[in-house]
Amino acid sequence: MGDVSIAVGCAVGLPVGLSFLLAIVFWIRMQRRYKKEDARDCELENIIRDESGFISFDNLGTWQETQQEKKDVYVNDESVESSGIQGSSSSEQLQQPNETHQNKHQSKHYMPAYRRNLNAYRIRQLPTGINVDNNGSNLSLDSTQNMRKRPNLHQETVYDQMIPVLANTEPKLFSEDNNEQDTAATIQQNQQNNEKVIMKNLRNNDFGSYPRGTQSATSLSRSNSNSNTNTNTNVSRSSLHTRSSSVMSAVKGTTSYDNVFDTPKSATAASLVDVKVSNNNNNNNKQPVYSLKNNYDIKNTSEIQEEDQYENEFTNYSESKRTFIDSLRPKPGI
């Protein structure tokens, strides 16, 4: 019995004991990890609360530069420019006040490298005797003109230091240098040019880039017969034009216009009808004439045989309907 109990205890107790030991070891390691994370969180909170440490928007006073500091930097830059040294020597002398300025105020705030380069570039672009203005909203509109015209310094905020804004030196329509009279004269000149272009296009029947619309031959012939001057002809033609292209408007002449009411055979039919009318007294032979059964064509109003304007000899719906009804009727003898 003793050997059996020992064997059972070893078989069950050893795995259970090892599992408990491993659980205790992992728990201790987890507690150490939690303590380290808590310590890091406390350090981050202290850095955030510290005014001379991490970036915080609650302590804007530490991010603002004083006016005297800006004047000192600008005076150092003037001394560099007045010395007449260019190239690497001027850049080294320009970096010296920036380095001293950075070392002096490193405990207050952190200025990125791109911001220092932008400030140095803007200072070099300014003329001598003008104070520095680092307003981001003014720079976005017209930095150079605002800096030249505003001698008072603007108190720099944290947003102006963190957001890089490049000066736009391109001339603008509504800049402060432009005079109101010059602007009004420019607008009036543009309006006159537009009116001249519009009148030129109207005289040339140039209404855009759409394809030229077709014209009715009958209405064109009536307008030409009733008008004796070129003015009436131009009016009738322009009234029949829907949209003429700019390319086709340059070429004007007495060209034949297509008939809107033409069908596949009506063009040849019209020519055949004209030949028949002219040779009616001398020629007794009948020529084949295509007779329309609709009211599309105005020339053969006497030959209209159907009231439906969509019917002709190819699409005779009434006849087809009668044929269909007759086919449904019972035939005799069946």
UniProtKB/Swiss-Prot annotation:
| Transmembrane regions listed in the UniProt entry | 8-28
Q: Where is the composition biased (Low complexity)?
A: 81-96, 218-248
Q: Where is the composition biased (Polar residues)?
A: 204-217
The GO cellular component terms are:
cellular bud membrane
Q: Does the keyword Membrane apply?
A: yes
List the residue ranges of the region (Disordered).
76-110, 204-248
Q: Which residues lie on this side of the membrane: Cytoplasmic?
A: 29-334
For the Extracellular compartment, the record's topological domain ranges are: 1-7
Q: Name one GO biological process term.
A: cell wall organization
Give the UniProt keywords, A-Z: Cell membrane, Cell wall biogenesis/degradation, Membrane, Signal-anchor, Transmembrane, Transmembrane helix
Q: Which domain of life is it from?
A: Eukaryota
Its topology with respect to the membrane? Single-pass type III membrane protein
- Localisation: Cell membrane; Bud membrane
The UniProt entry's sequence similarity note says: Belongs to the SKG1 family.
Q: Any idea what job this protein has?
A: Plays a role in cell wall integrity. Affects the cell wall polymer composition in the growing region of the cell.
Record-given protein name: Suppressor of lethality of KEX2 GAS1 double null mutant protein 1
Give the species this sequence originates from: Zygosaccharomyces rouxii (strain ATCC 2623 / CBS 732 / NBRC 1130 / NCYC 568 / NRRL Y-229)
Q: Source taxonomy lineage?
A: Eukaryota, Fungi, Dikarya, Ascomycota, Saccharomycotina
